[in-house]
A protein has these predicted regions:
Chain A
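A short, basic N-terminal segment
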Residues: 2-123, 301, 305, 404
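Surface-exposed beta-strand-to-loop junctions
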Residues: 84-92, 168, 219-228, 339-344, ...
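Phosphate/oxyanion-binding active-site loops and adjacent basic polyanion-contact surfaces
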Residues: 95-107, 136, 183, 235-243, ...
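P-loop NTPase nucleotide-binding core
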Residues: 119-134, 138-255
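Short coil/turn segments at secondary-structure boundaries
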Residues: 141-142, 159-160, 167-170, 276-278, ...
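Short glycine-/polar-rich loops that comprise or flank the Walker A/P-loop
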Residues: 150-152, 310-311, 342-348
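C-terminal alpha-helical "lid" subdomain
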Residues: 218-222, 244, 248, 252-258, ...
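Sensor-1/coupling segment of RecA-like P-loop NTPase cores
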Residues: 256-336
């Protein structure tokens, strides 16, 4: 009996050995001759060049071959996405001394849809969903840069949660409708962001109807969008109304002027679910406000309804926009709730997955290239495997872990 | 030599003719004879140790003198009789009680074992008491009542054991035995060297790698004597001397009586069996526990590093710390990314669950690694169960250790 078990074990051991001796190399991208854009310290000659970049900086030309590779966003286009970017990303880019984004599959999928779109139809809605930190926001940025190159007008809400929470915020009763509430500071901020993203395109656009602010102040027919924005920035009281005016004019003129309008809303579920008791916005009577009562949210919701054409709405749902006890799942139907799902339905869901092994390796290699990973063990195959295991190949998690190495 | 009586040895010894060893030989022989002549009393006791219970069956030869019984002996005999009577009745009670219990449980009284008794007691008298020692129990009386040392001297007041006056007869006779064996080995060595057979001695020394000497506590229990630290050291030194002799493997059985196996040796049996599934994929199953969590881990080889924990992947653990816990066995065994694991884990919190999975994973991985890696894993502490548990709250205190705030008034 003992002998047979011994025999069995030894045979297993030999089989195991044969498997163990097979050293499976991690499959990386093959090196390509890509230019070195950075002004950072020059690479040493003897260092092997790790393939993690592509020289194709035009996001419109990215194909499936580029998936997992980093491309450099030129300075002038960086200005477009910069204002809407999370400070965390900006800090990372500053540390790396260059602004690079990874080409991901969902972005390509989205671009494929946009290329084949018939703009005459009512606005189609795309909804990105995925785990926390899987790259939904950067996918949006990738797409925005793409559309910016194509000359689209971009209407971008970087983080919808900002408009429904905060106990320190100034909340004013709307000058347009008394049962609605304005957020003057947020509206002004958004106007600046809108102006920065569409620099040079707004002066040609004129209003098509008259808007009366007060008895003495009004915007005549034919006022340029620039002027509306300037007015909103100088008279904060009307900044929310200015946002409403701009959005309405865009909806009306998109078809007549032949515009292409890209509406991007990050963490759209903030529009449809109630934020928690402590930090939800409150009016002067300390009454908690529903998202729909806030004029900014109200106006943006109109942009998401299929009542106009020559536009596209791309949204992302995120767990962070929901209350802490409503973050069990990351699917749109769970995060949006009944109301949100009905409002956005029908939409095209796009899943943003965590990194594949190739993408994760490319990311780690990029960090090594940027000296973000300095630990020698982190540069070995085993170290990379451990990083991938602990982070579970989640991009944000990987970045957090690598920050300590 | 055989014709010389033990008493003659003494004479020889007192003369200067014979060596001391001669005395040793005879004394040892006498010791063995003594052991053979005496039978073991209380042999029904489960762990009856012959060192403890040595007592003669009436061996006193009829003498012309009137038998005088010393006072101490008389007192002892009374005590012993009382003890014996008590134990006899207890044993009878226990046997009857066991039969009753078997009848209550509707089982055959003749084949009712101690395990059945334990099960029956737990069923009939369920107890929620925290301390297991405080719960009702029914066991052989010899296990429950403290043992009593049998009389060490006969009716005439003469001690049975020839080392009685050393106070620690068992201890010193053990030392004696060791010395004797060592001397014998030395003789043998001399003889082999004289016959030029040194090459036969290769590999004849005892391998101490997988075991260690019994602890002082264990030695005390084994000898039933109050052995001190100093005496224990003396014992170990002597044993070391025996074990390091080039021919010590000949006395392996004797040496192993005084040694306990290390964990690694026990582990050999703990390696899970490898099953081969359809498609030639091997898998091994093991379980692990930590705190109050239990995990059953099934490891597949070859794999690609996929984890399935209660139907989720590694996101089952939200914190990196817990994933790192799982990482360690894979890194130490060098199987990271080469195996898949299917985990069923229940109870407890994330720390306990991660620890339980780690233990189960390490045990399951044993099936796929080499001997040296197994040893490495053991040394890393992967195969050791973390015995810590939540400590109970005590009455009159705020928690397990914390006291209520003390207020003067």
């Amino acid at each position: 009996m003992a002998a047979s078990i011994g025999q069995k074990l030894s045979s297993v051991a030999s089989r195991t050995n044969s498997l163990l001796k097979k050293t499976v190399k991690l499959t990386e991208h093959t090196p390509c001759a890509c230019p070195y854009y950075s002004t950072a310290a020059k690479r040493l000659e003897h260092e092997p060049r790790i393939a993690c970049r592509t020289s194709e900086t035009d996001p419109r030309k990215h194909t499936g071959d580029h998936v997992g590779l980093y491309y450099t966003v030129p300075e002038e286009e960086m200005a477009v996405i910069k204002t809407g970017m999370h400070p965390w990303h900006l800090r990372m880019m500053k540390s790396f001394n260059e602004s690079c984004l990874m080409v991901r599959k969902p972005a390509l999928e989205l671009k494929g849809y946009l290329d084949k779109l018939n703009l005459k139809h009512p606005v189609p809605r795309f909804l990105l969903y995925g785990r926390r930190g899987s790259g939904k926001t950067l996918t949006l940025h990738h797409t925005m840069q793409c559309c910016h190159k194509d000359g689209w007008i971009i209407v971008h809400a970087p983080w919808a949660g900002q408009w429904v929470r905060g106990w320190y915020k100034e909340v004013a009763v709307s000058t347009y409708k008394p049962d609605r509430y304005d957020l003057p500071a947020d509206s002004a901020e958004w106007l600046t962001h809108f102006r920065a993203q569409n620099l040079g395109k707004l002066s040609e656009l004129k209003t098509t109807s008259e808007y009366i602010w007060t008895k003495r102040e009004k915007a005549e027919v034919g006022t340029s969008f620039e002027e509306i924005i300037n007015f909103g920035l100088s008279r904060l009281k009307f900044s929310s109304d200015c946002v409403g005016v701009l959005l309405k004019e865009l909806r009306v003129q998109a078809e007549t002027q032949g515009l292409k309008v890209l509406v991007v809303v990050d963490s759209v579920n903030a529009f449809y679910v109630q934020w928690n008791q402590q930090n939800a916005l409150k009016n002067m009577e300390k009454k908690q406000l529903r998202p729909g009562e806030i004029s900014l949210v109200h106006n943006f919701k109109k942009m998401l309804s299929p009542t106009w054409s020559h536009g596209v709405a791309i949204c992302a749902v995120s767990e962070e926009a929901n209350d802490e006890d409503k973050r069990e799942d990351f699917t749109p139907i769970y995060l949006l709730g009944q109301e949100g799902f009905e409002a956005l339905d029908p939409f095209i869901p796009i899943y943003v997955p965590d990194y594949t092994e190739k993408e994760a390796l490319s990311n780690i290699n990029y960090y090594i290239d940027r000296n973000w990973i300095q630990n020698d063990y982190g540069k070995t195959d085993e170290g990379k495997r451990e990083l991938m295991f602990v982070s579970n190949r989640n991009p944000f998690n990987l970045a957090k872990i690598c920050a300590q190495l | 030599m055989a014709g010389i009586s033990p008493w003659a040895v003494k004479t020889v010894h007192k003369g200067t003719v014979s060596s001391r060893r001669l005395f040793v030989i005879f004394a040892h022989k006498r010791f063995l004879e003594f052991r053979a002549q005496n039978v073991v009393r209380l042999s029904s006791a489960p762990d009856g140790n012959d060192r403890l219970h040595i007592a003669p069956v009436t061996q006193n030869k009829p003498t012309a003198k009137a038998v005088t019984i010393s006072k101490a002996m008389r007192a002892y005999m009374e005590q012993a009789r009382a003890y014996d009577d008590k134990m006899k009745s207890e044993v009878a009670d226990f046997e009857i009680g066991k039969r009753h219990l078997a009848n209550i449980m509707g089982e055959d009284p003749d084949s009712f074992t101690q395990e059945d008794v334990d099960r029956a007691i737990e069923y009939l008298l369920p107890s929620g008491l925290y301390d297991k020692k405080a719960r009702p129990v029914m066991k052989d009386p010899y296990e429950i009542f403290p043992k009593k040392k049998a009389a060490q001297f006969g009716l005439d007041g003469r001690p049975y054991h020839w080392m009685y006056f050393t106070i620690l007869p068992n201890y010193y006779s053990a030392l004696y035995e060791i010395t004797w064996k060592l001397e014998a080995l030395k003789d043998l060595e001399d003889q082999m060297r004289a016959e030029n057979r040194q090459d036969e001695m290769e590999g004849q020394s005892f391998n101490t790698a997988s075991s260690e000497w019994v602890s002082l506590q264990a030695l005390k229990t084994k000898m039933v004597e109050n052995i001190k630290e100093k005496e224990y050291k003396h014992f170990v030194t002597l044993m070391e001397r025996l074990a390091s002799h080039p021919l010590s493997a000949r006395e392996k059985d004797f040496i192993m009586e005084w040694r306990v196996l290390l964990q690694s040796e026990e582990l050999q049996s703990a390696v899970p069996e490898v099953e081969v599934e359809e498609g030639g994929r091997m898998c091994a199953t093991a379980s692990g526990t930590r705190k109050s969590s239990n995990a059953i881990v099934k490891v597949y080889m070859p794999g690609s590093g996929k984890f399935n924990i209660n139907g989720k992947d590694l996101t089952y653990f939200s914190q990196n710390l817990y994933r790192e816990t799982l990482l360690l066995p894979l890194v130490v065994s060098g199987l990271l990314g080469k195996v898949d694991a299917e985990v069923d884990v229940e109870l407890g919190g994330p720390t306990g669950q991660a620890g339980a999975i780690r233990l189960g994973l390490s045990r399951a991985l044993l099936a796929f690694v080499e001997e040296d890696v197994k040893e490495k894993m053991r040394l890393t502490g992967l195969l050791t169960k973390d015995p810590r548990k939540r400590e109970r709250k005590k009455p009159g205190q705020q928690g397990a250790r914390r006291k209520f705030t003390w207020k003067k008034r």
